[in-house]
Amino acid sequence: MINELLLIFSVVFIYGMALLGYALFGKAGLYCISAVATILANIEALILVNAFSMEQTLGNVLFAVTFLITDILSECEGKKAANKAVLTGILSSVFFLVLSQSWMLYNPSPNDTIMPSIKAVFSNTPRMIFASLTVYAISQLFDVWLYHKWWKFTEKKFGDKRRFLWLRNNGSTPV
């Protein structure tokens, strides 16, 4: 039961931070949250937990907020801003990948006690980040594209571009 409560708290906290970031900093706040979420999701993806009667990675919650971010940006700032958030997430993950792999090249001090743990955690990073970034890029760019297709369809069909927000959000993200 504790895992379920922690996941619910995590979702509320992470989504709340995305909304707070947008309220305080506008697009820049969402770009920042997107970058942090993609980096941390790749680390959290190493952790498997049992919650809600299924095994899952913790990275799922952080990756989920990136869909909220692109939907907010699509709705309020436009398609270009939403795609920029996707590219920001990719760039930040590539930056993290290169930097974290460079750590493995250093010769640690004889007094170091952390390097074995760092190597254990980050030895899978390149493969995981490459795989997750490929899926992230495809799914996010498709989500943004489909969001705007739904938007054009509902505007053409009903003559109001602000109606059917629920359809744009729910019709693009699950696919």
Predicted feature residues:
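Membrane-interface interhelical connector segments
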Residues: 103-127
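Small-residue-rich segments of transmembrane alpha-helices in multi-pass membrane proteins
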Residues: 34-46, 89-101, 170-173
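Internal alpha-helical transmembrane segments of multi-pass membrane proteins
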Residues: 155-174
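Hydrophobic transmembrane alpha-helices
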Residues: 1-73, 80
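Transmembrane alpha-helix/helix-exit interface in multi-pass inner-membrane proteins
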Residues: 87, 91-110, 136, 140, ...
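Transmembrane alpha-helix boundary signature
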Residues: 44-53, 76, 98-111
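Membrane-embedded alpha-helical bundles of multi-pass transporters/translocases
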Residues: 127, 131, 135, 166-167
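Helix-boundary and loop/linker segments of multi-pass membrane transporters
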Residues: 24, 117-123, 155-159
